[in-house]
Each structure stands twice: as C-alpha cells, then as structure tokens.
C-alpha cells in the first residue's frame, strides 16, 4: 500500500531496533517510580495501564503508517531529485516506525496485540479511517507536504521523547532509534529557533 518503486529503497532495511541502554531499567515517574521497568505484559500491574500502553503503541503506529499513505503519491511530482530522496527517506523511516509498533503489539501483547496490529494495516489514510483526523486529510501538493511535516515532525519528536520514558521497557527502548531517525526528518525543515 505504500506505492513506490521498491528499487528506490536501495539497501534500506525495515529492521526492528532497540536501545536498551537509553531506555533504562527503573520507572522514572509516578506511583511506580524507582521500581523496575516492566518487560512483559503480565508484569504490568493493572489492566487499565496495559490498555493505555496498547493504545499509545497503536496510535503511534497508526500515525507512522498514515503519513506514508498520505504522502507517497508526491514522489512522482518531486520538485528536485533531492526532494524526492528526502521524502523517500522520511517515508521509509516512518514505515519502519510503524513496523516497530506492530512488532511490539504482536510480540508483547498476545492475541489482543495481534488484533491491534492487524488494524494498523486495515486502516488507511486515503479511506479516511486513520485514528487521528490530521492523518486523514489529503496532502495534495508539495507545499502541503512541507508545511505538514514542518509541524507534525516537531510534534512527533516530543511525542517520541515522552514515550522514551515509558514504564514499559520495550516501548521506551524503541524510542532511541526512532528519535535518531526523526532527527533526519526534522533536518529537512529546521528553523533557527528549533535546534535538532
């Protein structure tokens, strides 16, 4: 459903990446501060917390896949080869982030997680079925793309930083590599007041 020529990917690989060192071993905030981070679903002490983590992972994955669906048609009308390659790299990394979230759901949350991961692939931005409305809006031309990514990628950086302190260690460990890749996304539209 991404819709671009696979040969454009070059040697890019959709690997699952973790940074366990940066994720830390202790919960940093809240009622469970100082306790070991949860590494498995059944270590999470309350069902409402498990549900909230599944929801956060699902929304994050949904936005990653949605942005690729929303923007991939622009590759055919890129103003320059540099713009095309930059947009393609953004789309590859966003797609990888979506796969990372699907991996977390399938690996750590049993049948419920598998169902939620399947929904990530069933929803589609062109059909207007993504969770967040801004990812269902059409991106019709490159000016839309530049403006959208300028603001959304900055918001995404703060969202990933927030998730990097998750009490669920696999989610926190996913954020280090995603933040490194997000810095490339931000580089495509930095402003003097927003250091990367």
What feature does the model see in each segment?
Residues 141-147, 158:
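Active-site-adjacent structural elements in folded domains
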Residues 187-196:
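Single conserved hydrophobic/aromatic residue that forms the stacking wall/gate
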Residues 174-186:
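Alpha-helical membrane segments in multi-pass integral membrane proteins
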Residues 74-85, 159-177, 193:
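Inter-helical turn/loop segments and adjacent helix faces that build the functional surface
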Residues 91-115:
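Carboxylate/His-rich catalytic cores and anion/metal-binding grooves
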Residues 63-70, 97, 152-159, 185:
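Amphipathic, well-ordered alpha-helical segments in soluble domains
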Residues 1-85, 107-139, 143:
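Terminal targeting/low-complexity segments that flank the catalytic cores of oxidoreductases
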